[in-house]
């Protein structure tokens, strides 16, 4: 019986070693996920960009990530009114900049 067990054990170990174990459910699958969000409002005038990191993206904590003028990334809760105000301001500013960049100055 021992001669049959050894090859089976070796094969089982080889299979386990070759194929990675599946990740546990509920883990942060994405590398960029926020571990927590700040409830304290962030001044809108220091924010230059934003992006969403939601549960659908593999993140356990849904968040809006604001990038500041100095390059810091701050995680905020997407359901807060102050977060919506900053996002609206950034979208409005972005729309203005796109409108200005498409206009051509007259050639004199």
Curated annotation (Swiss-Prot):
Disulfide bonds join 33-59, 34-75. One of its GO terms (molecular function) is chemokine activity. Highly expressed by dendritic cells in mesenteric and peripheral lymph nodes. Significant expression in spleen (T cell zone or periarteriolar lymphatic sheath) and Peyer patches. Low expression in thymus. GO terms for cellular component: external side of plasma membrane; extracellular space. GO terms for biological process: CCL19-activated CCR7 signaling pathway; cell maturation; cellular response to prostaglandin E stimulus; dendritic cell chemotaxis; establishment of T cell polarity; immune response; immunological synapse formation; inflammatory response. Residues 1-25 form the signal peptide. It holds the Pfam family IL8. The keyword Phosphoprotein does not apply. Keywords: Chemotaxis, Cytokine, Disulfide bond, Glycoprotein, Inflammatory response, Secreted, Signal. InterPro entries: Chemokine_b/g/d, Chemokine_CC_CS, Chemokine_CC_DCCL, Chemokine_IL8-like_dom, Interleukin_8-like_sf. It comes from the Eukaryota. Transmembrane segments: none annotated. Glycans are attached at residue 100. It is found in: Secreted. Belongs to the intercrine beta (chemokine CC) family. PANTHER family: C-C MOTIF CHEMOKINE 19, SMALL INDUCIBLE CYTOKINE A. Strongly chemotactic for naive (L-selectinhi) CD4 T-cells and for CD8 T-cells and weakly attractive for resting B-cells and memory (L-selectinlo) CD4 T-cells. May play a role in promoting encounters between recirculating T-cells and dendritic cells and in the migration of activated B-cells into the T-zone of secondary lymphoid tissues. Binds to chemokine receptor CCR7. Binds to atypical chemokine receptor ACKR4 and mediates the recruitment of beta-arrestin (ARRB1/2) to ACKR4. Interacts with TNFAIP6 (via Link domain). This is C-C motif chemokine 19. It comes from Mus musculus (Mouse).
């Amino acid at each position: 019986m021992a001669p049959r067990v050894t090859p089976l054990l070796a094969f089982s170990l080889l299979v386990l070693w070759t194929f990675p174990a599946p990740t546990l459910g509920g883990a942060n699958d994405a590398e960029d996920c926020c571990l927590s969000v700040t409830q304290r409002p962030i001044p809108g005038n220091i924010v230059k960009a934003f992006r969403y990191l939601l549960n659908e993206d593999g993140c356990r904590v849904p968040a809006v990530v604001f990038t500041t003028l100095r390059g810091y990334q701050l995680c905020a809760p997407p359901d807060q009114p102050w977060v919506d105000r900053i996002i609206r301001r950034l979208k409005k500013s972005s729309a203005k900049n796109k409108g200005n960049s498409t206009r051509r100055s007259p050639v004199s």
